[in-house]
Regions:
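Transmembrane-helix exit segments and adjacent C-terminal regions of multi-pass membrane proteins
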Residues: 2-28, 32, 192, 271, ...
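C-terminal membrane-cytosol helix-exit motif in multi-pass small-molecule transporters
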Residues: 180-198, 215-224, 243-256, 497-502
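Transmembrane core module of solute transporters
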Residues: 17-67, 171, 178-179, 207-209, ...
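Interfacial helix-cap and linker-helix signal at transmembrane-aqueous boundaries
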Residues: 45-46, 77-78, 165-170, 223, ...
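Transmembrane alpha-helical cores of Major Facilitator Superfamily
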Residues: 29, 61, 65, 92, ...
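Transmembrane-helix signature of multi-pass solute transporters
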Residues: 93-100, 182-189, 245-249, 321, ...
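C-terminal module of multi-pass small-molecule transporters
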Residues: 82-91, 105-108, 127-128, 136-143, ...
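Helix-loop-helix hairpins in multi-pass membrane proteins, especially solute transporters
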Residues: 71-208, 234-237, 317, 359, ...
């Protein structure tokens, strides 16, 4: 093994391994909470700091942009100079960004500090999974990754709930102060985490780091800004052109490097490539579903941000219930069929949601969400374990970073592309419903979004306003349900990729270690690699 550890996996006590997992889970929780907690604070931030709509978007997107752009670099720094060391640096950077965001008095300052948080997260997130990979022997790794995945799902669900309650009861800055005690707990827990790194003295792949970081930032910028600027606008075409040029240059540099940051040979392995692609598509479908349901709950049904967050929780509960089963089932049926079961459950859940109407009962929504989340919990740990099993432990940080990049790109691309389709469908539907009923300028304003329609309706005579609200709500629901169908189609494509590229059974050495844990004294048959 080409990784040095203060304590190697087979020498680490079982109690200490699970303590390390708890600390890594706290780090993961911080990152995933921050992905969603700010959304509920945006209206209050807009009023207090006078932020425009585009600035509010960048308060959210600055975090995603920096996080996605620097993940590969963050993973590589941990591999080469110490995963524990760079995770601690990341926690401090994230804390500095959180304090700055809580204290800032300008919208521009808040955008900047969100970027600092993204930098910290890019150092923390790949370190958590790579440390787990190096601390846990293969026989326990699937279970540990299942718990790590469940905590990520919990963070996604807790963000809107905690954010809604804090904004309603304390104020928007409290969503950033929330991170400080969690960060303190993680930093104290790092005392128990052994150091690990690639024992080869490779140094930093500076050309690869620069090309990958700038290329990913250009790509994510194009994805984020595409819906607003227009996919064929010069700004977006330049961003995508830069992304293609820089990432192609990155591939060329890595292919020629004696010590590449991201060895391209990983992608020649069908299981690695298949798991990365499938994971991106799964997150694509997942975040789109949450994105539109949150708007439906708050704008169409008139619920508070806190209530909307609570109604998303069943998906997180489903993930928490499904993730621990993943490690058990993957040994019995293999990753391919487990991923197929995951996608099937998620497709079932999202198709059940296509029947949502304005007056749909809470139960008719949370049951499909629970099925959706349970499916995600079943399969996502198996996908992550497949990615990590395909890379040497010395490169665990970069393997973890690729896993995380696929998540971030999948989520950003899903919200941007399906969001564009849904906005277009909404605009067309509401225009057809209102043309000839209200002035054309009102139709134009209402067509911007269902949220704008609510504001416009309040300024109109009561009867006309009610007509506008009814048309806008129905147009949004019809468009949202179309978005759910597109999401289901994307999940079907994940099934095709999984069936084609994901192996029927785990890698031989991985399966052998799993079975040794179940029956240490028993003979271990060699599994099929088909």
């Amino acid at each position: 093994m080409s990784t040095t550890l203060d304590t190697r996996p087979d020498e680490t006590s079982s109690r200490r391994r699970w303590l390390v997992l708890a600390v890594m889970s706290i780090g993961t929780l911080i990152v995933f909470i921050d992905n969603t907690v700010v959304n509920t604070a945006l209206p209050a931030i807009s009023i207090d700091l006078g932020a425009s709509t585009s600035t509010l978007q960048w308060i959210v997107d600055a975090y995603v942009l920096v996080l996605a752009g620097l993940l590969l670099l963050g993973g590589s720094l941990g591999d080469r100079f110490g995963r524990k060391r760079w995770m601690i640096v990341g926690l401090f950077v994230f804390g500095a960004g959180s304090v700055g965001a809580a204290l800032t008095t300008t919208a521009g300052g808040l955008v900047g500090f969100r970027g600092v948080q993204g930098l910290g997260a890019a150092l923390v997130l790949p370190a958590t999974l790579s440390i787990i990979t190096n601390v846990f022997p293969r026989g326990e790794r699937a279970k540990a990754i299942g718990i790590w995945t469940a905590v990520g799902g919990l963070g996604i669900g807790l963000g809107p709930v905690l954010g809604g309650w804090l904004v309603d009861n304390i104020g928007w800055s409290s969503v950033f102060w929330l991170h400080i005690p969690i960060l303190a707990a993680a930093l104290i827990g790092m005392i128990f985490v052994p150091e690990s790194r690639d024992e080869r003295d490779l140094g930093l792949d500076l050309p690869g780091a620069l090309l990958s970081t700038t290329g990913l930032i250009a790509l994510v910028y194009g994805i984020i800004q595409g819906p607003e600027a227009g996919w064929s606008s010069p700004e977006i075409l330049v961003a995508f052109g830069l992304a293609v040029t820089l990432l192609t240059g990155f591939a060329v540099v890595e292919a020629r490097s004696e010590a590449p940051m991201l060895p391209l040979r990983f992608f020649r392995q069908r299981d690695f490539t298949g798991a990365v692609l499938t994971l991106g598509l799964i997150i694509f479908g997942m975040l789109v579903t949450f994105f539109f349901l949150t708007q439906f709950f708050q704008i169409v049904q008139g619920r508070s941000a806190f209530e909307a967050g609570l109604l998303i929780i069943p998906a997180s509960v489903g993930m928490i219930l499904g993730a621990p089963l993943s490690g058990v089932l993957v040994k019995k049926i293999g990753p391919r069929y487990l991923v197929l079961a995951m996608a099937g459950a998620m497709i079932t859940g999202v198709l059940l949601l296509t029947g949502v109407e304005i007056d749909s009962s809470t139960l008719s929504i949370i049951i499909p969400l629970g099925i959706f989340g349970f499916g995600a919990g079943l399969g996502m740990p198996a996908l992550t374990d497949t990615v990590m099993a395909a890379v040497p432990e010395a490169d665990a940080g970069v393997g973890s970073a690729v896993n995380d990049v696929s998540r971030e790109l999948g989520g950003a691309l899903g919200i941007a592309t399906i969001g564009s389709f849904v906005s277009s469908f909404y605009r067309s539907n509401v225009s057809d419903a209102l043309v000839g009923t209200v002035p054309n300028e009102v139709v134009e304003l209402v067509g911007e979004s269902v949220g704008v329609a609510t504001v416009v309706a309040a300024s109109l005579p009561e009867e006309v306003g009610a007509t506008v609200i009814a048309a806008a709500n129905q147009a949004f629901i019809d468009a949202m349900n179309t978005g759910f169908r597109i999401s289901a189609a994307v999940l079907v494509s994940a099934i095709v990729i999984a069936f084609t590229l994901i192996p029927r059974q785990m890698r031989a050495e991985q399966a052998t270690e799993e079975r040794k844990v179940d029956d240490p004294a028993g003979a271990v048959p060699e599994p099929s690699a088909a």
